[in-house]
Amino acid sequence: METLSQRITSMESVQLQGIAVAFVTASALYYVLPAAISHIQLSALPMLGKTEVVVIPPKLLSELSKSPRTLSAEIAGNEFIAGKYTKVKALTPILLHSITKYLIPSLGRNAVVMSEEVSNAVRLGIPTCNDWTGVNIYPKIMRMVTVSTGRFLVGSELNRSEDYIDTVHNYALDVSSAQSAVHKMHPWIRPLLAEWLPEIRRLRKRTEEAFALFESLIKERMKMQRELSESELPDDLLQWMIANRHNYNNEDAHDLVYSQLGLTFTANHSTASTITNALYTLATMGDLIDVIRDDITQALAESGGQFTSKALDSMWKFDSFIKETVRMNPLVMSVAVRKVVEPIKLPSGQVIPTGVTLETPLVAVNLDDQIFPNADVFDPMRFYNLREKDRKQGDAREAEFNQLISSSTSHMSWGFGKHTCPGRAFAAQQIKMILAHIILRYDIKLVGDSTDRYENIPKGHLSLPDPTKDILMKRREI
């Protein structure tokens, strides 16, 4: 299998007033050498569709986080998604509150419900495969994710509806197209012409369809909120948002729909891509499948066959494999993206002016041999071995840093600091459940005689699994 370092694209750098300035395309940044970051203080990168971007090494993140008023993740995110024109609201205050206060604490009591939803989605989504059968897996995974996520976002009234599945899926596609179209326009022209772009108008139409789809459900849920006791209410994100909307000035049903759509846009595709990346890797490593399957089976045996949160947490080898997959196949090129709203003076004396965007190249962290020895080699048991070592030494805190949902300057796939993905525990549980149900039911391998993992596709700031590829699947006798 080709290592990540072998896919690095060269870039031309020059020194300007003591700061390394690199002229690269957006996709080339994904392949920045770790050495290029670890040996310089800052790199200034002119990026397509953006003002100047300053790439900062991870060692500066903790220092910068001490002055939160000088940086804005919200402004940076809104610029990235062209929110002024797409109207995407990725993480509104009411959504953040509902996720952290209600969704994450509900994972334990709803784990079996999620497992049942996933089991049904896998059963309906994948062919019988009594013999080795080619399966275009990404679209099927995307549907499984949409349905199982939807159960906890909008409830059982909508999550399996074809109208809901189609709306959520196509909304994400339309947002991506609209975002790309806006960024291709010169910033000075956008206020005049962006609203007339075909991609923006198509997105508006899609959003109106979503409003129509959600309207009757939201009205019914508001009625339930007025008339039913708390124990009788649906246990999902929509109801929690309705219950708290007065505290966040979200009394308009449209605000609730925008929040729901923004969440599905950011969550569903990243979850589906992570699962697909894991399956593409597993298809090249037949011996590993048995190891992972045994880990899952042992944990389920200790939980009475139920996919409880405790059972999922005890699958250390499975967890390690997924975390290593995420490390070697990051979906985004950069993390900790912030807009400078007040000038920042660094310990070195350098000053970063207002208006600059800061970000840290994720691959530079993931391929740093000082953090991960033999960093460009895929080691599925890397984090399992580290956790076992920490456990034997009685260092429970350090062991936590080596599990899938951990976040630090060494583990940045979920983001960093107070803007670390608030729903990562939900996403991790869902990723494990979908993969586990597939691994327990099917053997998988690549099509033909190839042993090389399918290449991911660079797309702007993203690196995505190829959605057109098939894997061979065969039903196991259980």
Curated annotation (Swiss-Prot):
UniProt-listed GO biological process terms: secondary metabolic process
Organism lineage: Eukaryota, Fungi, Dikarya, Ascomycota, Pezizomycotina
Gene Ontology CC annotation, any one: membrane
UniProt enzyme class: oxidoreductase
TM region(s), chain numbering: 20-42
Protein name, per record: Cytochrome P450 monooxygenase ATR3
Organism expressing this protein natively: Stachybotrys chlorohalonatus (strain IBT 40285)
Gene name of this polypeptide: ATR3
EC number of the protein: 1.-.-.-
Main location: membrane
